[in-house]
Amino acid sequence: MKAVNLVSLFEESVQKHADRPVLIADNQRITYKQLQTAVSAVYQSLKKLGVQKGDKVAIMLPNIPEFVYYCFATFQSGAVAVLLNTSSTSYELTYLLNNSDAKILVTHPSGEKRYQEIKDKLETCYTVLAVNPGQNHVAAEPAGSPGPLSAAIDPDDPAIMIYTAGLTGKPLGAVLTHANLCSELDMVHATFRRTPDDVGLCLIPLFHSFGVTVNMLNVIQAGCSTVMMDRLTMDGLFSTLEREKITYIVAVPRLYMGMVFYEKAAKYDLSSLKLCVTGGSAMPADFIPVFEQKFSVRILEGYGLTEASPACSFNRMETVAKPGSIGTALEGIDIKIVDEDGREVPRNTIGELIVRGGNVMKGYYKDEAATASVLKDGWLYTGDLGRMDEENYIFLTGIKKRMIITSGFNVYPREVETILNMHPAVQDALVTGKEDLLRGELVKAQIVLRDGFHPDEKDIIRHCKVYLSPYKVPREVEFVSAITQVP
């Protein structure tokens, strides 16, 4: 029986796998039953704070067990988990909390400091919960204490909201329902075929759509376990792979490149590793066979976007991958390549990818115009350009919208340009992507200065760091007499 919402999915998995480990972090092994106890405790805490169905609970945490506790407790409350990047600056956080109508912010101590800086500017978020990793949420419940009584959850109720870069310079909140995510999970599960014996490595941030779907929700669905890593070194990565007998990794291309170039790799036993999955940015086609030969494991590349929960297409274990391809549509998803008028183009003709399926978002929060611009007649217009061959393999060729993809994160130039133009010395600015082997692209800024001002590159970057998350900050600044490239 397929789960109809994330709460029933969680409860069914706890019943089936109660004594199996689910979360492994800092040598702590948390079973499904202990996870349920922790979620129950957090649920009761949220209930005492007045969290009700439909409320927004903002979660800004790294990859620690408490992220999972608060997510599922929020689902059980019938509330919406608003997942926020832990590197969000005070400037960004003010907008995100106000735009989302968040009632509570759950964060780490450094996030609490940012909250205190902006609390007088907040319109709805009057409560902050500072989480210290390792808090004792998994202690046994007192005898006779009632378990959580979940709110009535409809499949079409919103479950998660994740902000994605907006064309206007302000992020848009993509609203994903319980039905969207359950549909996505069924497709992902059919593709990767995880079993309770699998042990994954949780590297992609859980606040990222791919991280929360594949490294949290699909783990619960499959009854397997995941090793949570918040900080990464190659020594730590390989030690963990060997010690925990990791069977699969989900990560951005940069990690796999680092693994290939790691000079001590041969001394570790990685024989347990069965599958590596990647996406978020393009993997150089000639790099994949190098990785597969060195580690004797398949690496599957795919494609997705936050608005689609996110995975849409993937290469498969049972098929031979075509170099440069993001695979074929997941079962249950329709993908077409269309022209400017929305008409399907012939095979091997470049056009825009559009997607249809139960995984496609409900819409952008409080932005009907932006929603209408991407959701048309049941199809999600992705803004990505590509072609499809006679065997339904998809190849990305470019981006219709102005966007930079760096280490799997989307950056819209307009947002960075807005911040650059706030600097008193800047008359005009243009932000573009510069090709980079490890990150895919780097953020580059061209700047025209006002007369009488002479800032250097460090001044401009320092200004950007005040307002922008680190991945959005330009890595290179070029001072020019005029902007030559038109957006």
Regions found by a protein language model. Give the residues of each.
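Conserved pre-ATP/AMP-binding loop-to-beta segment of ANL
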Residues: 3, 19, 144-163, 170, ...
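Conserved ATP/PPi-binding loop(s) of AMP-dependent carboxylate-activating enzymes
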Residues: 328-332, 343-374, 411
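Conserved AMP-binding/adenylation subdomain of ANL enzymes
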Residues: 182-199, 207-248, 258, 262-264
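Structural core segment of the AMP-binding/adenylate-forming
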Residues: 48-49, 72, 76-140, 148, ...
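Conserved AMP-binding A3 loop
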Residues: 31-33, 159-183
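Conserved AMP-binding/adenylate-forming core of the ANL superfamily
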Residues: 2, 6, 19-64, 68-72, ...
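AMP-binding/adenylate-forming catalytic core of the ANL superfamily
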Residues: 88, 105, 249, 357, ...
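Gly/Ser/Thr-rich phosphate-binding loop
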Residues: 246-251, 260-321, 334
